[in-house]
Amino acid sequence: MPTSSAVYTTFAGQIRNKTISKGGFTFCLAEYLHPALRDIEKMPEDTFDQIVDKYVEMNVAHPFMEGNGRSTRIWLDLILKKRLGKCIDWSKITKNDYLNAMIISHTKSDRIKELLASALTDKINDRETFMKGIDYSYYYEQED
């Protein structure tokens, strides 16, 4: 059996070429992934709602075999920082609330928008906020 580092070396950072699913939800089919990513790239990101819509679409695309949640949360913070001078204080969002909001976000994004808006901060250069965000990002992915 290959080690986890050997497995990650084979696909880490590469756009997936297989269709994947989780919890009964099938993410963007592999054959449509590249066009979907091009469309997501073109989406506007001028307002908070537009940025979160883009984030939701990237979650549905799920471009990698592993690490989608962690990488897209960092990606979201980078867009928010660049466009709005804000980021998410992930310590203000519980794992359960976040995961439940993300599960329904592809059909109803209001809940994830409310949740993220409630945790917006202007501490974009605060190292502690950034590092806590990474810690929480891993926590959201852990099995209970």
Regions found by a protein language model. Name each.
Residues 1-144:
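FIC/Doc superfamily catalytic core
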